[in-house]
Amino acid sequence: MMPLGMVEIGESGVIGKITGQDEVRQHLAELGFVMGERVTVVRKMGGNLSGAVKDSRVALSQSMAMRVLVN
């Protein structure tokens, strides 16, 4: 597994694990980042990234993106 923040633009992966405290994991789940869901990196800008998950685009900070591990 690798952190979502390391995935190249246009590439995707399936979420295998989300690290961090319960509040962080809950927040990411509310945004659609749940285990088994496919996420695609759409854009990177200034350390942040935009990801496509569950038919939505979501912007994440680099620190949050590093908590989402994909296969």
What kind of region is each of these model predictions?
Residues M1-N71:
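Compact, glycine-rich, soluble single-domain proteins
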